[in-house]
Amino acid sequence: MTLQLRDVRKSFGATAIIRGVTLGIEKGERHAIIGPNGAGKSTLFNLVSGRFAPSGGSILLKGEEIAGLPPYRINRKGLARSFQVTNIFPRLSVYENIRCSVLWSLGHKYNFWKSADKLADAHERTERTLALIRMSARRNVSAGVLTYAEQRALEIGITIAAGADVILLDEPTAGMSHSETANAVELIREVTEGRTLVMVEHDMGVVFNLADRISVLVYGEIIATDVPERIRENPAVQAAYLGTADDA
């Protein structure tokens, strides 16, 4: 298992948000976590990525305990995430945004006397990432003037540019039009090839299109984990989240 959660719990005061989540995700798997608002999906992502420390349980990345580690250390171990709110450097160009992530991953530190433009290894990886997210032609555009869909694509590029092989995407298609969503799905499919993807997403079309398996989180507990076809037909999942044909 690339990512394992064992009886993971998180409480804020007397309020239990995550209630004993156990989940295993295989290397190269595309895994979606779905559930109603307030189910604890973003909290679970925050636990895995190190923004929150769990109240109990274990989180293993490639067999190594990461529960309670700070985000930068987890990132160094090969896990990166995006957020519901786009997290980019709006005043930097598309190229510079990607290069910042690459420089971090390569361990380059700020040096007043040395231009980052002369770092061949960083330049090559930046160019590869730009091509992968289809933004080579937009490389010199300030990130702040990109369309919303382009900014989301850039954020995915920043996420993978650091060399992470486990990617957490939080609502990657939220706020997109139908055509933008279709393009985003193909982009996510391409950039996660050979990587492990864990995704929180409300658009069921996206979920059933991309996911190898789906976990359903309700009130901080996983009530089902299975392949998309069985999740769609699961009576407990229909009652808790998806609804039935009669509800349409």
Predicted regions and their residues:
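Glycine-rich phosphate-binding loops of nucleotide-dependent enzymes
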Residues: 1-248
